Amino acid sequence: KAIDNLKLIKLQEDSISENTCLHLGHAYLRLDDLEKAKLAYATAIRYNIDPKLREEAMYNYVQATYLHNSALGESVTAFQDFIQEYPNSQYINKVYTLMADMYLTSKNYQAALDALLTIPTPDDKMQETMQYLRYQLAVDAFVQGKMTDVIKWANLVIENAAQPSTYKTEAYYLAAQAHYRLHQYPQTIAQLQLYLEQSNIAESTNKTMALYLHAYALFNQ
């Protein structure tokens, strides 16, 4: 009903039309008609008459683009346009969070982490996500055989851990594996000792392998 009523308004180059398109977008968004929501918000943005309405329309366009699972390039452009135009917006942290989630879904962990690192005061959930991303970057580096990068990312996980956590514990183990492959046996032993000292070590599935690795490192040093 709201959509039918809004459609009756003749669109012109004025603030009433801009507001109409914004609310059409809201109505379509509630109906999960994301393509029509995007078009309505895009029209409101194009009018560019009321600065506050434009900001709200751009933010909601970002949301609709994200929810629509649009092509990565289109989504990135929407995020970047908003961030560039409204760096101090009340919506900016939410935009960065959505941007990070988009990159996370596409497994672009570095870009996701970069997006979250721009948030001045990340909450606990964001901090946890950043730890996950650092750990995944360490794992990816390990798979690619980039042991120096493994150590770098594992150390960042450890340094940014406010308390014992799975990521911190496993980062010690991953760093030990990287040091071992670099034939750095004293560092391997040191990382494994820290790994084994963690309060949640009983939850780790790598404990048995760590003990073997510890013995091999002692033998080789």
Where are these regions (language model features)?
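Acidic, polar-rich low-complexity tracts and alpha-helical solenoid repeat scaffolds
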Residues: 1-221
